[in-house]
Amino acid sequence: MSKIRVYEYAKKYNISSKEIITKLKEMNIEVSNHMTMLDDEVVNKLDNEYNNEVKKPSVADEFEVEEKVVRSKKNSNKKKKKGKGNQDKRQENFAGKQQAQTVETPDKITFSGTLTVGELANKLGKEPSEIIKKLFMLGIMATINQDLDKDTIELIASDYGIEVEEEVVIDEIEFETFIDEQDEEEGDLKERPAVVTIMGHVDHGKTTLLDSIRNSKVTAGEAGGITQHIGAYQVEVNDKKITFLDTPGHAAFTTMRARGAQVTDITILVVAADDGVMPQTVEAINHAKAAGVPIIVAVNKMDKPAANPDRVMQELTEYELVPEAWGGDTIFVPISAIKGEGIDNLLEMILLVSEVEEYKANPNRYATGTVIEAQLDKGKGAIATLLVQNGTLRVGDPIVVGTTYGRVRAMVNDIGRRVKVAGPSTPVEITGLNEVPQAGDRFMAFADEKKARQIGESRAQQALLAQRGEKSKLSLEDLFQQIQEGDVKEINLIVKADVQGSVEAMAASLRKIDVEGVKVKIIHTGVGAITESDIILASASNAIVIGFNVRPDVNAKRTAESENVDIRLHRIIYKAIEEIEAAMRGMLDPEFEEKVIGQAEVRQTFKVTKVGTIAGCYVTDGKITRDSGVRIIRDGVVIYEGQLDTLKRFKDDVKEVAQNYECGITIEKYNDIKEGDIIEAFIMEEVKR
């Protein structure tokens, strides 16, 4: 007999190779694996071993063998009956399938969104054809794949006496909606640093204060190193941290709030002791109040001889900021940012407010937060400064930021050091995003990169569709409809006028408007032209801008168009009041609308006998037409409105002059034109309704 391998022997006797190897080892015969050759002597020994085992079968084994024989006989008989036997089997299978399809009708079904006819039939345990018949009886022509709305689903289910419950499914694509609404267990919440923004008028010492705090309180490990500017930084006071946003104060409120982000916990309002309350101070107060954050007043420049802190306190009481010493609840801290005096006291007050407000977050979850700054770097790609507001962000986390996505490749803290984790209220600069996000975008970390990518792409697509069919902000045209639907309980207004008296008169008159269920709230007033800052505040607060004898500048117009902010311009106070009141009562029906078609800057003036003053102009925007109405604007204030008398290019009369061309203009019955004036051309267009 020739030699045989282990696996061949195992196959021959229907035994596993492993069993053969084990048996050989028990017999003290060494084999390495299933490919080992077995000689005749070893094969004989194995045969003897297995023959002895086969000769002593148990009763159970005998019964099993007999059963197998009987089964095999039955099977062989069945194979002979080819025709009728197979038919019987098919009938048995069909009966079995019918039995499986008979599903008990449930007492209750749940669904989310919509269901197709097929899905509803499956849930109800009915045939789709039966559901289609019922729909037909209701006058609805439907196919098996047609979507049914909630009312139709409830109607069909009630016909079978089945209760319907709609599941509320959280759409992770819209993660902003549930970031703020997530209920955290009290035990999971830990104390977090306060996020502080410094605001105030130009040259009142905001930047100096930031530098003073940074130079005196940054961590010692930074000394001698290169500080990386990431738009935010942390300082440590009495073993507690405070996060400062090193961004233009108003941007921290407006741009971010316009995108639904609330990043600031405390506002430091810097007011110069020698200068008092100025226009931008008032603007800052209105921004902070609109955001609903506590205000600490830092009375700066106390080292100057003309410093008068009592005057500052007195002026701020007019804006409901009453010092604690006078029975109010606003903290006032006298400081000198340039000399570093009072800084420690200011920081202690921040900690005190933080302690009272109890700022907390849950660090044991995936991170959520807001973009502070973002830019494109040639070497690193998209870079974003993120403020973690809840949870902990880690290197390697898949992340969705606004409409962008990626994985956190690297994180750098405020002192330029690489870090692996960032907890609540910590600012970090990250790389790894596919595109540059926008300041104020919300972000969320996810467990799965595939999921993050899918959500990021869906959000980008959604944003594109929203941009195409963009719905405007609150406007007078749809105001009454929104009031009727209960969407509007309060109308936010921003009032700008040419003089303070007009501002006060306009504001007082608007506040007197009395329409049931709706009240007027004036969030900001000011003197002078309507600026971009006014438009951004209006966008963030969903407000309407009312201008009396003032005009928006070019940037304000552009921003108003992009942000869909409604600007209403008037020259008579009672008409402005009438328009707002009519809108609130649903009686607004203007027939014509003014459309500004161009602007020209007066570069030079010429006085000509019997003609008057000729304005040598340069068209800066749009076009000036012969039949358009014009108004003269000086320093943002309208000083005259009338009609064009002549419009010339060189010596020729022309119908219109386009942008970037020079022209000569005379205005009917008006000669007081000066260099630097802006001539604005407008036409009246019929409003389509």
Curated annotation (Swiss-Prot):
What keywords tag this UniProt record?
Cytoplasm, GTP-binding, Initiation factor, Nucleotide-binding, Protein biosynthesis
User: Cellular component GO terms, alphabetically?
Assistant: cytosol
Compartments in which it is found: Cytoplasm
Region (G4), start-end ranges? 300-303
What residue spans carry the region label G2? 225-229
* Region (G3), start-end ranges: 246-249
Q: Which InterPro entries match?
A: EF-G-like_DII, IF2_II, IF2_N, P-loop_NTPase, Small_GTP-bd, T_Tr_GTP-bd_dom, TF_IF2_bacterial-like, TIF_IF2
SUPFAM superfamilies listed in its UniProt record: Initiation factor IF2/eIF5b, domain 3, P-loop containing nucleoside triphosphate hydrolases, Translation proteins
User: Where is composition skewed (Basic residues) in this entry?
Assistant: 71-84
Binding-site residues for GTP, renumbered to this chain: 200-207, 246-250, 300-303
Question: Where is the segment annotated G5?
Answer: 336-338
Q: Where is this region: Disordered?
A: 70-107
Tell me one GO molecular function of this protein.
Answer: GTPase activity
Question: Which parts of the sequence belong to the tr-type G domain?
Answer: 191-360
Task: Name the family the entry cites.
Answer: Belongs to the TRAFAC class translation factor GTPase superfamily. Classic translation factor GTPase family. IF-2 subfamily.
Name of the protein in its database record: Translation initiation factor IF-2
Q: Which organism is it from?
A: Bacillus cytotoxicus (strain DSM 22905 / CIP 110041 / 391-98 / NVH 391-98)
The major lineage groups are: Bacteria, Bacillati, Bacillota, Bacilli, Bacillales
